């Protein structure tokens, strides 16, 4: 079993396991994941360790299918590693139908609780087993566990009151969503969807008409037409007696070759015509509009990424890539004309966990360094700057303000940017700087207070 993962930049993920206790429903023991702990990062950026633990109950093995159907309940504990490894929150996922062949992997409810058991959020799911239209042979029938209803709730931690949104779905004989209704206090929203049916080509999932309404009033209505291959050739946006119509044509590979937009007050219609490459038939090489303007793109054959783009004014942009497919240079029209090797150049230093960007400037290039921690998170940037000091301009490195996070990835403190000697621009700065603000959260992850450096 996998016990640990070492990330490319040096961070670690450690996984622990334990065995379940045998029971009648689950004879024998099973190894289950008991905890996951991630370590890494810089201490000055806050928490360097996060941890979740897991508990399982209600495991079931079907004796007829000779297969394990999963646990009825899984609890995930969120541990506050910055506060003595105390329990902060926990969530419970329930698989209430884990004794059925078709539904044993479906969540029937999930709730988030505070450490002392007060509900924060919840969702309840109900499913309907539908037999899809596959012919008259019942032995070949396909059963689809369709989500029939979903009720999502947010709870007030203090009073226990809740605000809920209920969603109900209906489906057609092919399992397509046909009706959607969202209901909450004093509000409801409905969507009804129909589909094209090209049975001989098994195309039954392309919407033909959709209506969105509330309280008997239609707020959005769309309809489509398709060709014999199921490709949408027309989209109509119903706007009373003045519908907006889009038309599309396709090539033999299914690419859009022409898209025509709705007409204006003079009955004129804008269109865009697309041309594709001759090798892959998927890369757009030119675009032409109704005015005769055109733009084009040439591609790097190794990465299928743009190498030269030409806009409608004939101005070019050039792009190059390194041996790993990463952006290496970008050259804009002015630099192409003046013969400069780049407008922007990118350099990568994974061993030092940093990237370097150089912006060309006649007055001197602008360097930008981005530093990552061992968990591969960007934590600091530095940029060339000029400040007035001692009666003259001084070239410095401007260090981004530090963001400090807690054990759950929330920003709890922010610090102002600072300057340093330009000679240190390529080295990570461990200094913290001046405090800007501290932020506190509730167990819903909502901001409850922001305190500035002066205490206000």
Model-flagged regions — what are they?
Residues 2-6, 13-16, 25-27, 32-45, ...:
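Beta-strand elements of repeat-based all-beta scaffolds
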